[in-house]
């Protein structure tokens, strides 16, 4: 058991979803409500001013106003107010990865050298003087499942670990450190345009401390705000031990997704799309799908076609530069039985490795992230002349709400001695309109091993 100081205020509530904040102050007709008021109640003529106040396209604000889960407050920002799912809709929990021996789950980092941070705060947090609750003090209790506020038991620590893995995978193609270790205040707050070290705090707590009657809240598009960054901290993710680690991560990634400028992915009259077959969008409600990804609305009757992977970098979380060559020229050498690793950062990214095979059986294994992977791998083997020996992309099948098979790729065959190239790329599966997904956001971390003999 790991002792941790927790704020004790009780533990209540379920969580799912997202919030974003925007406030309206109209200085001339048509006037807008002072707030908090449903965005849908704002006169159509006033939405232009709302858009200007938030740096959003007016078409996007109009789309947000067509739903029932955004409101305007008194701080010139928009926030969403998500419905809490009934208990029977909570995702079926599957066994997730265990914590490796010796691992401190409160010192995890996905990219420790990054200047951007997403801090997953499970230990309780107090805020005051911010835009939340008009500056009144808010005391959020720690994530807790056993009523013991003084320490995290093994089950609680496991949820922290799994939520970290899944959130880190969602942001793995971006230059940002997802961490459970509390950073210095300066690593979160941004003080002006010249401050290049900043981020956001996501508070994971079982209690609806903002009184929204919802499952989470976060301001939209404020991750890189240079003028009043601290006013819009933190993001809130309301979750308890009834959620799997993946479901907790879905809330975190959804809420911090609002921070980096994203709105909701719905379908038809539904503001939140729950997905189809094995897939769902992060900015929808993909809690019940084993594969969740960023989206650009390729499914049928999508309410939003915003390009998530372009919008996120516009708000300070830039896409990683390519870590491995895309062709045989400059391919990364891979030694026998040693593991190579990389990130497929974009739909166009292909990572190429070179392997000297001694002849006989050649075995190659490409694995995505070990938990809640976003990357569906295609593995291609070519000989020294560039001729394709094999292309491996197994079908994807659901195991449960948290896991799917077929995201990995493996090869085993007798081949002549020589140098072979092994290519890893992200691909889609099925028809993205109705039962699958494209390669658009089939991105993320992987490991690659090869063995002769």
Show where each model-derived region lies.
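Secretory targeting and sorting signals
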Residues: 1-29
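Residue-level recognition of alpha-helix boundary/capping or hinge positions
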Residues: 245, 249, 253-255, 260, ...
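Primarily auto-inhibitory N-terminal propeptides
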Residues: 19-146
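Low-complexity, Pro/Thr/Ser/Gly/Ala-rich linker/spacer regions in secreted
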Residues: 33, 95-96, 100-103, 316-326, ...
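Acidic/polar, solvent-exposed loop segments in beta-strand-rich repeat domains
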Residues: 131-153, 292-297, 372-373, 430-441
């Amino acid at each position: 058991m790991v002792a941790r100081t927790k704020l004790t205020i009780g533990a209540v509530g379920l969580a799912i979803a997202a919030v974003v904040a925007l406030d309206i102050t109209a200085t001339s007709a048509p006037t807008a409500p002072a707030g908090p008021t449903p965005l849908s109640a704002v006169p159509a003529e006033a939405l232009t001013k709302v858009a200007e106040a938030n740096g959003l396209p007016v078409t996007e604000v109009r789309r947000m106003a067509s739903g029932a889960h955004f409101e305007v407050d008194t701080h010139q920002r928009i926030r969403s107010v998500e419905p809490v799912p009934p208990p029977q809709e909570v995702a079926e929990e599957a066994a997730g990865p265990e914590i490796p021996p010796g691992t401190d789950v409160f010192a995890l980092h996905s990219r420790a050298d990054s200047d951007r941070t997403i801090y997953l705060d499970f230990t309780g947090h107090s805020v005051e003087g911010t835009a939340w609750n008009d500056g009144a003090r808010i005391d959020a209790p720690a994530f807790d499942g056993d009523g013991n506020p003084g320490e995290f038991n093994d089950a609680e620590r496991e949820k922290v670990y799994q939520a970290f893995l899944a959130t880190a995978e969602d942001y793995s193609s971006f230059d940002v450190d997802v961490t459970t270790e509390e950073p210095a205040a300066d690593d979160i707050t941004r003080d002006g345009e010249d401050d290049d070290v900043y981020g956001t705090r996501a508070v994971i707590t079982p209690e609806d401390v903002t009184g929204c009657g919802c499952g989470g809240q976060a301001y939209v598009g404020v991750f890189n705000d240079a003028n009043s960054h601290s006013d819009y901290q933190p993001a809130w993710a309301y979750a308890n031990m009834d959620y799997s680690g993946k479901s907790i991560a879905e809330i975190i990634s959804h809420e911090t997704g609002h921070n980096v400028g994203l709105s909701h992915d719905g379908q038809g009259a539904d503001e939140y799309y729950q997905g189809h077959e094995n897939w769902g969008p992060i900015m929808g409600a993909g809690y019940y799908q084993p594969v969740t990804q960023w989206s650009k609305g390729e499914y049928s009757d999508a309410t939003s076609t915003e390009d998530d992977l372009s919008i996120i970098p516009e708000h300070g979380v830039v896409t990683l530069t390519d870590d491995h060559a895309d062709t045989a020229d400059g391919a990364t050498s891979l030694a026998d039985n040693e593991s190579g690793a990389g990130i497929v950062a974009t739909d166009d990214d292909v990572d190429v490795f070179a392997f000297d095979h001694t002849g006989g059986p050649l075995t190659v294994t490409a694995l995505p992230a070990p938990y809640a992977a976003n990357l569906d791998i295609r593995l291609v083997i070519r000989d020294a002349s560039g001729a394709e020996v094999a292309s491996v992309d197994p079908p994807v099948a659901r195991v449960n709400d948290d896991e799917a098979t077929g995201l990995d790729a493996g090869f085993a065959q007798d081949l002549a001695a020589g140098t072979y190239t092994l290519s890893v790329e992200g691909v889609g599966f099925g028809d993205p309109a109705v039962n699958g997904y494209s390669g658009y956001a089939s991105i993320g971390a992987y490991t690659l091993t090869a063995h002769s003999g």
